[in-house]
């Protein structure tokens, strides 16, 4: 298996498969650890697309690990130092090399922590309707891609594969996970976003918004899980191409979303196939985001 061979699905027999998500396959190592393998699957509008993107899973893993290390002083994360090759059979090592991580086994919270620094995507659509995003009132007169006065926390539900995440207010988040956890994940998410924003800007990138996911320890402590500040979970823009009122080119899934929108797809399975050129350009955008962030 080479880096250029897309990995749409893993086939690890030495560990039990617990879950196959939009991008990641999750295996049980033991009662306290999981093996998470980022495949090259790509989802858009909560639908898995039929064509994998070469090397995407490895890029996501490297970028996530970069951010997990960079933000470890702000928030606990699920990453362990165990090499993924050490928990699978020798003949399966190629499947996890560069794209697998061994992590703490935690209870996932049923919400996703979205932080927005700019008005884009579904946030812009919501603002156009009623001037709010996830119950957060914003000033009048903002334009698409405008920088917000300050970053805002706009959580969503955590949908099953094939379903859509739905925006919820902070009060609804409290109803789902309790006031203490809701406050803590909001604080952590905003602090991580602030650090990442400052760093990315020094590299010529804008992080318009991002999604964090959290688990909890048996003691009730929040821990960042899944991925962190990747091109799948974030909207990255080149700073020199940003201007309010327009959508900048993006180093993330927005290129695919725009392509699918142009096709007139109804955003329901099955998704249309991607052309070879779209696959190639998407792979290059992921690699470029990694280069700019981690060089």
UniProtKB/Swiss-Prot annotation:
Signal peptide: none
A GO term from the CC aspect: cytoplasm
Pathway: Purine metabolism; IMP biosynthesis via de novo pathway; 5-amino-1-(5-phospho-D-ribosyl)imidazole-4-carboxamide from 5-amino-1-(5-phospho-D-ribosyl)imidazole-4-carboxylate: step 1/2
Annotated PROSITE patterns: SAICAR_SYNTHETASE_1, SAICAR_SYNTHETASE_2
Keywords: ATP-binding, Ligase, Nucleotide-binding, Purine biosynthesis
Protein name: Phosphoribosylaminoimidazole-succinocarboxamide synthase
Catalytic activity: 5-amino-1-(5-phospho-D-ribosyl)imidazole-4-carboxylate + L-aspartate + ATP = (2S)-2-[5-amino-1-(5-phospho-beta-D-ribosyl)imidazole-4-carboxamido]succinate + ADP + phosphate + 2 H(+)
Cross-referenced NCBIfam families: PRK13961.1, purC
SUPFAM superfamilies, alphabetized: SAICAR synthase-like (SSF56104)
A Gene Ontology BP annotation from the UniProt entry: 'de novo' IMP biosynthetic process
Enzyme class of the recorded protein, top EC level: ligase
Keyword ATP-binding found: yes
Family classification: Belongs to the SAICAR synthetase family.
GO molecular-function terms, A-Z: ATP binding; phosphoribosylaminoimidazolesuccinocarboxamide synthase activity
Organism: Halorhodospira halophila (strain DSM 244 / SL1)
Membrane spanning residue stretches: none
EC number: 6.3.2.6
């Amino acid at each position: 298996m080479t880096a250029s061979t897309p990995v749409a699905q893993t086939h690890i027999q030495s560990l039990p498969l617990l879950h196959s998500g939009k991008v990641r396959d999750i295996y049980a190592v033991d009662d306290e650890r999981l093996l998470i393998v980022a495949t090259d699957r790509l989802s858009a509008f909560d639908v898995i697309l039929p064509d994998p993107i070469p090397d995407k899973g490895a890029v996501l893993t490297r970028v996530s690990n970069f951010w997990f290390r960079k933000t470890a002083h702000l928030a606990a994360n699920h990453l362990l130092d165990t090499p993924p090759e050490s928990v699978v059979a020798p003949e399966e090592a190629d499947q996890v090399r560069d794209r697998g991580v061994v992590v703490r086994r935690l209870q996932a919270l049923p919400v996703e922590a979205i932080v927005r620094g700019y008005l884009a995507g579904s946030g812009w659509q919501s603002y156009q309707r009623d001037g709010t995003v996830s119950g957060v009132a914003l000033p009048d007169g903002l334009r698409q891609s405008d920088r917000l006065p300050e970053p805002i926390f706009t959580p969503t539900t955590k949908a099953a594969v094939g379903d859509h995440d739905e925006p919820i207010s902070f009060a609804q988040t409290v109803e789902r996970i309790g006031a203490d956890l809701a406050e803590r994940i909001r604080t952590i998410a905003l602090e991580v976003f602030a650090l990442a924003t400052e760093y990315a800007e020094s590299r010529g990138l804008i992080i318009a918004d991002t999604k964090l996911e959290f688990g909890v320890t048996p003691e009730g402590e929040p821990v960042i899980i899944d991925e962190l500040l990747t091109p799948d979970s974030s909207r990255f823009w080149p700073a020199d191409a940003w201007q309010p009122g327009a959508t900048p080119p993006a180093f993330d899934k927005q290129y695919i979303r725009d392509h699918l929108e142009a096709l007139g797809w109804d955003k329901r399975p099955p998704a249309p196939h991607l052309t070879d050129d779209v696959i190639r350009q998407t792979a290059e955008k992921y690699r470029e985001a990694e280069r700019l962030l981690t060089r």
